């Protein structure tokens, strides 16, 4: 629908705007992505979608629009699934031995450097920094899930 409205609007532009070049581009969704849009309009970016835009439109006011609500709300189950997924991707952890209550050092045979790498991977996954004092206490996946749920205010 939006493409029909845009094409109808562009076709009604005065002849002075006719020689403006049209450019094919791809809209890519990114965390906190920004996109040019008309004033007061919000644009929802999906997967790679071609968009036809005018290279220059004199007199149009544009602003940056941010998408803050793109992610679904966190749940305890969702946090647990993401934590276990990140841990299963870690090459030093045997996925068959991994459970929510597996101790990193006692059950999985990891050392303190591996534990630091796991915490860094969790920071990347969830988008916030875990202080070293708190990171030293996180020795199993369930403790990580509880910590993230506490920091992100997730309660069920």
Curated annotation (Swiss-Prot):
<dbReference type="GO" id="GO:0016226">
    <property type="term" value="P:iron-sulfur cluster assembly"/>
</dbReference>
<dbReference type="GO" id="GO:0140978">
    <property type="term" value="F:mitochondrial large ribosomal subunit binding"/>
</dbReference>
<feature type="transit peptide" description="Mitochondrion">
    <location>
        <begin position="1"/>
        <end position="68"/>
    </location>
</feature>
<dbReference type="GO" id="GO:0006633">
    <property type="term" value="P:fatty acid biosynthetic process"/>
</dbReference>
<dbReference type="InterPro" id="IPR009081">
    <property type="entry name" value="PP-bd_ACP"/>
</dbReference>
<feature type="modified residue" description="N6-acetyllysine">
    <location>
        <position position="88"/>
    </location>
</feature>
<feature type="modified residue" description="O-(pantetheine 4'-phosphoryl)serine">
    <location>
        <position position="112"/>
    </location>
</feature>
<dbReference type="GO" id="GO:0006120">
    <property type="term" value="P:mitochondrial electron transport, NADH to ubiquinone"/>
</dbReference>
<comment type="function">
    <text>Carrier of the growing fatty acid chain in fatty acid biosynthesis. Accessory and non-catalytic subunit of the mitochondrial membrane respiratory chain NADH dehydrogenase (Complex I), which functions in the transfer of electrons from NADH to the respiratory chain. Accessory protein, of the core iron-sulfur cluster (ISC) assembly complex, that regulates, in association with LYRM4, the stability and the cysteine desulfurase activity of NFS1 and participates in the [2Fe-2S] clusters assembly on the scaffolding protein ISCU.</text>
</comment>
<keyword id="KW-0597">Phosphoprotein</keyword>
<dbReference type="GO" id="GO:0005759">
    <property type="term" value="C:mitochondrial matrix"/>
</dbReference>
<keyword id="KW-0679">Respiratory chain</keyword>
<feature type="domain" description="Carrier">
    <location>
        <begin position="77"/>
        <end position="152"/>
    </location>
</feature>
<keyword id="KW-0809">Transit peptide</keyword>
<dbReference type="GO" id="GO:0005509">
    <property type="term" value="F:calcium ion binding"/>
</dbReference>
<dbReference type="GO" id="GO:1990229">
    <property type="term" value="C:iron-sulfur cluster assembly complex"/>
</dbReference>
<keyword id="KW-0443">Lipid metabolism</keyword>
<keyword id="KW-0596">Phosphopantetheine</keyword>
<dbReference type="InterPro" id="IPR036736">
    <property type="entry name" value="ACP-like_sf"/>
</dbReference>
<keyword id="KW-0496">Mitochondrion</keyword>
<dbReference type="GO" id="GO:0000036">
    <property type="term" value="F:acyl carrier activity"/>
</dbReference>
<dbReference type="GO" id="GO:0005654">
    <property type="term" value="C:nucleoplasm"/>
</dbReference>
<dbReference type="GO" id="GO:0000035">
    <property type="term" value="F:acyl binding"/>
</dbReference>
<keyword id="KW-0813">Transport</keyword>
<dbReference type="GO" id="GO:0099128">
    <property type="term" value="C:mitochondrial [2Fe-2S] assembly complex"/>
</dbReference>
<dbReference type="GO" id="GO:0009060">
    <property type="term" value="P:aerobic respiration"/>
</dbReference>
<dbReference type="InterPro" id="IPR003231">
    <property type="entry name" value="ACP"/>
</dbReference>
<dbReference type="GO" id="GO:0005743">
    <property type="term" value="C:mitochondrial inner membrane"/>
</dbReference>
<keyword id="KW-0444">Lipid biosynthesis</keyword>
<dbReference type="GO" id="GO:0044571">
    <property type="term" value="P:[2Fe-2S] cluster assembly"/>
</dbReference>
<dbReference type="Pfam" id="PF00550">
    <property type="entry name" value="PP-binding"/>
</dbReference>
<dbReference type="GO" id="GO:0042776">
    <property type="term" value="P:proton motive force-driven mitochondrial ATP synthesis"/>
</dbReference>
<dbReference type="InterPro" id="IPR006162">
    <property type="entry name" value="Ppantetheine_attach_site"/>
</dbReference>
<comment type="similarity">
    <text>Belongs to the acyl carrier protein (ACP) family.</text>
</comment>
<comment type="subunit">
    <text>Mammalian complex I is composed of 45 different subunits. Interacts with ETFRF1. Identified in a complex composed of MALSU1, MIEF1 upstream open reading frame protein and NDUFAB1; within the trimeric complex, MIEF1 upstream open reading frame protein functions as a bridging scaffold that interacts with MALSU1 on one side, and with NDUFAB1 on the other side. The complex interacts with the mitochondrial large ribosomal subunit. Interacts with alpha-1-microglobulin chain; this interaction is required for the maintenance of mitochondrial redox homeostasis.</text>
</comment>
<dbReference type="GO" id="GO:0009249">
    <property type="term" value="P:protein lipoylation"/>
</dbReference>
<dbReference type="GO" id="GO:0005739">
    <property type="term" value="C:mitochondrion"/>
</dbReference>
<keyword id="KW-0276">Fatty acid metabolism</keyword>
<dbReference type="GO" id="GO:0031966">
    <property type="term" value="C:mitochondrial membrane"/>
</dbReference>
<dbReference type="GO" id="GO:0045271">
    <property type="term" value="C:respiratory chain complex I"/>
</dbReference>
<protein>
    <recommendedName>
        <fullName>Acyl carrier protein, mitochondrial</fullName>
    </recommendedName>
</protein>
<dbReference type="GO" id="GO:0005504">
    <property type="term" value="F:fatty acid binding"/>
</dbReference>
């Amino acid at each position: 629908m939006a493409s029909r409205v845009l094409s109808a609007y562009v076709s009604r532009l005065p002849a002075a705007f006719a020689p403006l070049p049209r450019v094919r581009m791809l809209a890519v969704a990114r965390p906190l992505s920004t996109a040019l849009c008309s004033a007061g309009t919000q644009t929802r970016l999906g997967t790679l979608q071609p968009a036809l835009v005018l290279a220059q439109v004199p007199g149009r006011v544009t602003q940056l629009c941010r998408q803050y609500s793109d992610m679904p709300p966190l749940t305890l189950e969702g946090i647990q699934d993401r934590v276990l997924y990140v841990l299963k991707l870690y090459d030093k952890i045997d996925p068959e031995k991994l459970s929510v209550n597996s101790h990193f050092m006692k059950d999985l045979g990891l050392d303190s450097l591996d534990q630091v790498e796991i915490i860094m991977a969790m920071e990347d996954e969830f988008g916030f920094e875990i202080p070293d004092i708190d990171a030293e206490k996180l020795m199993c996946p369930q403790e990580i899930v509880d910590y993230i749920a506490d920091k992100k205010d997730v309660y069920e």
